[in-house]
Amino acid sequence: MSLAGGRAPRKTAGNRLSGLLEKEEEDEFYQTTYGGFTEESGDDEYQGDQSDTEDEVDSDFDIDEGDEPSSDGEAEEPRRKRRVVTKAYKEPLKSLRPRKVSTPAGSSQKTREEKALLPLELQDDGTDSRKSMRQSTAEHTRQTFLRVQERQGQSRRRKGPHCERPLTQEELLREAKITEELNLRSLETYERLEADKKKQVHKKRKCPGPIITYHSVTVPLVGEPGPKEENVDVEGLDPAPMASALAARAGTGPVIPPARCSRTFITFSDDATFEEWFPQGRTPKIPVREVCPVTHRPALYRDPVTDIPYATARAFKIIREAYKKYITAHGLPPTASALGPGPPPPEPLPGSGPRALRQKIVIK
């Protein structure tokens, strides 16, 4: 518990408060804002000898919408007595409201003309409306208005009547020559700037040394070339059904779009780099692809007697029948004596195997 709350109050507490309030200076805010909050002196009681022009109010604002206008003025006195005196503020010694002074008709007309020239903020309509404009703001507005008026007057004097005479042909040619020189200088400057800009463009840097380029594309698929067809004349084999079947298959089949495949190309800039990555060795022999002379298919077997490759059993039978007909017509070949009794065969040449002794029979 604090000491101030526990001790007894002083007997002299508040004696100097009234003196401080009397010495307190009046604040300018309460005198200027909204026309002032202080009451006028001598307004406590109604004074009948005062002129009616001081409190004269327009009839449109004095009469309510629901009330009828009264001609005897009975409601004037109670309305004035209804004001409440504010005790929080000290009444000033003199009234802040300037009293109207009667002026002649000539001066009033001159005043109206001056008000028409002033802005709306500085015009005083003569009514009892209290404005909230400070003195400094009013002075600043007045000076601004005077500066605007002076600027407008100077512009009017400068804009006086001015007529330009038409130029002669000699003057036009002289002006065109000056313009041409200016354009040429501007063009030279522009070309020089463009040349400097081109010099500053970075050139494409080339990589020194060997380069390996990798490029992958899609190309149409090209079939491998097939073996050359051999005409085989075999009795008992009718080629008409095969030809008709192939023609029917080619005519009725759907149109297939060409197939595509992927191809990858690796390019070397020089031969040394290529040989470094792919050293040259012994070239392997590519095996010869043998084809059956009857079916024109890759041969999977070989006839041990005639040494002719074949693909199916039917082709083997056709080859043997052709071999029998050849023997019947021409007899056994010279090398066929090795199969039966007779003189021994000649010695094989060096480097030749058993297959070198066989003679390939060509079937026509």
From Swiss-Prot:
PTM notes: Phosphorylation is enhanced by ZNHIT1 and promotes the interaction of VPS72 with histone H2AZ1.
Positions where Phosphoserine occurs in the chain: S129
GO cellular component, one term: nucleus
Biased composition (Basic and acidic residues): 127-142
Sites of the Glycyl lysine isopeptide (Lys-Gly) (interchain with G-Cter in SUMO2) crosslink: K115
Compositionally biased region (Acidic residues): 40-75
GO terms for biological process, alphabetical: positive regulation of double-strand break repair via homologous recombination; regulation of cell cycle; somatic stem cell population maintenance; transcription initiation-coupled chromatin remodeling
GO MF annotations, alphabetized: DNA binding; histone binding; histone chaperone activity
The protein, known as: Vacuolar protein sorting-associated protein 72 homolog
Source species: Bos taurus
Gene name linked to the record: VPS72
